[in-house]
Regions:
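C-terminal catalytic core of Y-nucleophile DNA break-rejoin enzymes
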Residues: 32, 38-39, 244-267, 276-298, ...
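Catalytic-site neighborhood detector that most strongly recognizes the C-terminal catalytic loop/helix
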Residues: 164, 172, 348-372
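N-terminal core-binding DNA-recognition domain of tyrosine site-specific recombinases/integrases
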Residues: 39, 75-147, 167-169, 189-190, ...
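Short, basic (Lys/Arg/His-rich) helix/loop patches that form interaction surfaces
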Residues: 183-191, 256, 271-277, 284-285, ...
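Short, polar N-cap/turn motifs at the start of nucleic acid-interacting alpha helices
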Residues: 219-227, 338-358
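Basic, Lys/Arg- and aromatic-enriched nucleic-acid-binding interface segment
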Residues: 129, 144, 148-150, 154-212, ...
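Conserved tyrosine-mediated DNA breakage-rejoining catalytic core shared by Y-recombinases
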Residues: 16, 214-268
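N-terminal DNA-binding module of tyrosine recombinases/phage integrases
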Residues: 9-13, 22-112
Length: 379
């Protein structure tokens, strides 16, 4: 005769504890009490049922937590290691675009709520993408936390209609912008700080966050030339600057050669600095967002004037720092095969795929399809 797996307690009940798929605040497995007055076999059936449901994400712990509270906890706990800009993006989505769900419990969330969040921002396609990513991740995490079932998650996230998002095409400097840049760099209209910033993003192709984080110790001489050591980013938390001792990715850690004309000016600029940071403002050892915005607007106004434009009728008004970075990459791509795609990616602190995309765009501009076809098909 088979021996009973579970024994009766003092009350004559078959009793055990089983893990419900969650954890205590201390990180231990949370176990629930199961009881059967019938038999050990009945209790074993209950145990196996719960274990199966936990294993297949079908077991749900009863909880009255509100969706918005869970979303905030998710951001604080699950995204703590992400870059500040990424955390800010998630926080913006939760507080501005999901806050209308503040009185809805997580267990009551439905597909309708997801679609409503998208519909409320339908005129902002990129924001809708971010809402979709955030909402979807929160729901998937709730499944892992046994707060909703995987089946419910599929129903919540299925058939969400998003507006069509057309990613803005990256571009290099156009001819008008190049001429205006050269004139401003040579005629003395730029402040020392403005000229230093343009020098770095034009001649070295650094991201804005990388350039603003530079200190005098990042400008180094090695052998017969100079280079910039890129190892950190400066991001803005609202208006306040914050230096992160990491780059956008591991590839961002690099040393970028500084061409001779740029090195000569940066040497002069650095000797005039009162502190260690290349870019700062009067009330801060680091540049604030408002100070940066004023500097960039001043640069745009001077470039626009050099191009023959005015405030009322601007010739240059959509220029961004990232366009200078794309221009740097494009100029290097024109030199292939004298320089390899792999080396360009290394200098950019980016992937080879990004460089290949830029290279393909450069080649498209140079292609004479009609002539090539006639030559290729000439019998």
């Amino acid at each position: 005769m088979a021996r009973a797996k579970y024994k009766k307690n003092s009350r004559g009940e078959y009793e055990t504890k089983v893990w419900d798929g969650t954890y205590t605040p201390d990180g231990f497995k949370h176990r629930i009490r199961l009881v059967s007055k019938k038999s050990s076999a009945d209790l074993e059936r209950q145990v196996n049922e719960i274990r199966y449901r936990v294993e297949h994400n079908e077991y749900v712990v009863e909880s009255d937590i509100y969706f918005i509270d869970y979303a905030r906890d998710w951001l604080q706990i699950r995204k703590a290691s992400k870059r500040t800009n990424t955390q800010t993006m998630y926080d913006n989505i939760i507080e501005k675009h999901l806050a209308f769900l503040n009185d809805v419990r997580l267990c009551d969330i439905r597909n309708m709520h997801f679609q409503m969040a998208i519909n409320n921002a339908m005129d902002k396609p990129r924001t809708c993408q971010q809402i979709y990513i955030t909402f979807n991740q929160i729901i998937r995490r709730a499944v892992a936390d046994n707060l909703i079932t995987s089946h419910d998650a599929e129903l919540i996230c299925m058939d969400i209609n998003l507006p069509k998002y057309q990613k803005k095409e990256k571009r290099a400097l156009n001819e008008i912008e190049k001429l205006a840049f050269q004139e401003c760099m040579n005629n003395g209209v730029l402040t020392a700080r403005e000229k230093a910033y343009l020098t770095i993003i034009y001649y070295c192709g650094l991201r804005r966050c990388e350039a603003l984080a530079l200190s005098r110790f990042d400008f180094k001489k090695e052998g017969g030339g100079f280079y910039l050591s890129v190892s950190k980013d400066l991001v803005f938390v609202k208006n306040d600057p914050l230096v992160e001792n990491k780059t956008k990715s591991d590839r961002g850690l690099r040393q970028v050669p500084v061409p001779a004309p740029a090195a000569k000016y940066l040497q002069q600029y650095i000797t005039s600095l009162p502190g260690t940071n290349l870019f700062y403002c009067q009330n801060s050892i680091l540049i604030t967002k408002s100070s940066y915005d004023k500097m960039w607007m001043s640069i745009l106004n001077k470039l626009n004037t050099a191009a023959g434009g005015s405030k009322k009728f601007p010739v240059i008004d959509d220029l961004t720092a990232h366009i200078f970075r794309h221009n740097y990459c494009s100029n290097l791509c024109y030199k292939i095969p004298a320089i390899s795609i792999k080396m360009i990616a290394k200098l950019m602190g980016d992937t080879e795929k990004v460089v290949i995309d830029v290279y393909n765009h450069v080649m498209e501009e140079k292609e004479d399809v009609q002539t090539v076809l006639e030559d290729a098909l000439n019998m």
